[in-house]
Amino acid sequence: MAIILGADAHGNELKEVLKSFLQQEGFDVTDVTDIDKDFIDNTLAVAQAVNDKDTNLGIMVDAYGAGPFMVATKLKGMIAAEVSDERSAYMTRGHNNARMITLGARIVGEELAKNIAKAFVVGSYDGGRHQIRVDMLNKMA
């Protein structure tokens, strides 16, 4: 499993914190950020890299998280969530099989962002009754 990270200029500093943290935690991290590009291009880079391999997960950071969430969910097969707390990050993996989260650097601080990232990447999809929802989401895009 690789954790694919991306950011725009507003999220790059927090993304670097997350990259260092996740590497220290022993995760394989790939940073696809092109700091000269908009959040749309960087979000697409993360989402496409996540979709390249079933086990990949993605985290995209900009100022507020909303824009990247909208971009990511336009891609076929991508289930993403905009999160600002640990529980939502963990639950969106377990119940929604989200493979990507978006964060806002102006919303969450460094420690919260680290907790969110860890909750997301250690979570696992529960399957079962949740698969009906996942199938419905995947039919939409």
Swiss-Prot record:
Keywords: Isomerase, Lactose metabolism. The keyword Isomerase applies. It comes from the Bacteria. Gene3D superfamilies: Sugar-phosphate isomerase, RpiB/LacA/LacB. It catalyses: aldehydo-D-galactose 6-phosphate = keto-D-tagatose 6-phosphate. Transmembrane segments: none annotated. It holds the Pfam family LacAB_rpiB. One of its GO terms (biological process) is lactose catabolic process via tagatose-6-phosphate. InterPro entries: LacA, RpiB_LacA_LacB, RpiB_LacA_LacB_sf. Coiled coil: none annotated. GO terms for molecular function: galactose-6-phosphate isomerase activity; ribose-5-phosphate isomerase activity. Pathway: Carbohydrate metabolism; D-galactose 6-phosphate degradation; D-tagatose 6-phosphate from D-galactose 6-phosphate: step 1/1. Its EC number is 5.3.1.26. The keyword Mitochondrion does not apply. Belongs to the LacAB/RpiB family. Heteromultimeric protein consisting of LacA and LacB. This is Galactose-6-phosphate isomerase subunit LacA. It comes from Streptococcus equi subsp. zooepidemicus (strain MGCS10565). The gene is lacA.
